[in-house]
Structure formats: structure tokens, C-alpha cells
Regions:
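Short loop/turn segments that flank or connect secondary-structure elements
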Residues: 1-228
């Protein structure tokens, strides 16, 4: 059963109501922190990790080693960085004293809540779905808040281009690994580790993310051609 506010798959998300940018959306975060508790499914993008690392003043790899676990997604075959829950509480490692300690740099999934986002890997078009929230309040109807207002306030619009490009590149990399035989290819693990460097770790927090992401992925493709 899908937990409220946390669709378990793209198929589950597609069953939720879809919302256009100009449609009313009156959800307001109440600051209760319920969405931060027992959160074990939060996969980070490279941009998410970079933003957290920059907020902490640490290199991305050190940030991942301290707060995340690394795995290889069974369906996409791609490396994934997942927030590791606090061993004592089971909550997000950045949830302390009933507040997010990295709120300005919170991951996309947190900023979206209770929305789900789907990105078309061919066109980079984004769609948003309303999931059943665990909490929150509602703004008065006369304020006429829309989905676009919510996205703007949560700084999701400002990062949309990076998130779309991330989705497109990850789909292309997944296809590359699948076509090369996936885990049956003896060079899969070295290739996947090299992909992890390009997507997550080979970044300076003193420089902007997107130019580094483009440079990393452009250098990655010829390497994968040789490795696979």
C-alpha cells in the first residue's frame, strides 16, 4: 500500500490527480515535520547532493559518505544515493528539534511534498500530481493560490531546467547500460562507478553545478563507449 504523500512507483503516481500550473492548489506546509519522520525512500539527484554539500561546506563525496547510502537501482542499473535515516530515530538525518537543518537546500522530493513530479525523458516536459498529504493546512479560497505559486515559492521553478536535464541524461545512461547487457556485462560495475562520479561526486561546491554536470557527462560518454 502506498503511504500518503509517497508514491512507490511511477504507476502509482499516475493514479493520482494531475494538476496544471494554473489550477488552484491550496496546500500550505504546517511545519509539523511528519514528512521527515521514518523517511527511508528519499533518493537524491546529483543536484540535490551538491546543494546539501554546499550548504554544509563539504565535498559531495564526503557528504554522501556521512549521510547517505549508495546502491545500484535494480531497474535502471544506475548508481543511486539515498539519504540514510538516523540510526536512533529512523528519521531524516537532517531533521533535528522538529525542524529541517538544511531547509534552504532541501532535496527536490521534500520541496515538492505533497506533489509528485514526472518528467518525460524524450521531451523534458514536466507533470505534477497531487498525492494524499499526511499533514498541512489550507489557504483561504479568496487568496486564489495556484500550483505555479506553490512551485515558485518552493524554488522548484528555479531548478526545473536542471532537474529536467538530469532526468533526460539518466534515462540515456540507463539505456546505455541496458543495451550493453546490464549486470551480465563484466565491465558493468566499473562503468557504474564511473557514472556515479560523473553524476554525484566530481563537483566543486565553489563552482555552479550545471556547467560541471555538462562537462562531466560529455566526458563520460566516450569513456563508456570504451568500457562497455
Amino acid at each position: 500500500m502506498t503511504e500518503p504523500g509517497r508514491a512507490e512507483s511511477a504507476a502509482a503516481l499516475a493514479q493520482c490527480p494531475r494538476l496544471a500550473a494554473g489550477e488552484p492548489f491550496d496546500f500550505v506546509c504546517a511545519g509539523c515535520g511528519d514528512c521527515c519522520r521514518n523517511r527511508r525512500d528519499l533518493v537524491l539527484s546529483g543536484y540535490d547532493l551538491y546543494r546539501i554539500a554546499r550548504r554544509l561546506g563539504l565535498p559531495p563525496r564526503l557528504t554522501a559518505d556521512a549521510f547517505c547510502k549508495q546502491e545500484f537501482a535494480p531497474q535502471t542499473l544506475l548508481p543511486a544515493v539515498v539519504l540514510r535515516p538516523n540510526a536512533r530515530t529512523g528519521n531524516c538525518p537532517f531533521f533535528e528539534a522538529d525542524a529541517c537543518t538544511i531547509h534552504a537546500a532541501r532535496p527536490l522530493a521534500c520541496a515538492l511534498y505533497p506533489l509528485g513530479q514526472a518528467i518525460d525523458p524524450a521531451t523534458a516536459a514536466m507533470e505534477y500530481y497531487v498525492q494524499l498529504p499526511l499533514c498541512g493546512t489550507r489557504v483561504p479560497a479568496q487568496e486564489q493560490r495556484t500550483l505555479q505559486n506553490y512551485l515558485d515559492d518552493a524554488a522548484i521553478t528555479a531548478r526545473a531546467g536542471i532537474d529536467a536535464r538530469w532526468a533526460v541524461v539518466c534515462t540515456q545512461l540507463s539505456d546505455k547500460l541496458q543495451q550493453a547487457g546490464g549486470r551480465e556485462n563484466p565491465r558493468y560495475l566499473p562503468a557504474a562507478r564511473r557514472i556515479a562520479r560523473a553524476l554525484y561526486f566530481d563537483y566543486s561546491i565553489q563552482d555552479d553545478f550545471y556547467p560541471q554536470f555538462n562537462a562531466n557527462t560529455q566526458a563520460l560518454w566516450p569513456l563508456l563507449d570504451k568500457m562497455l
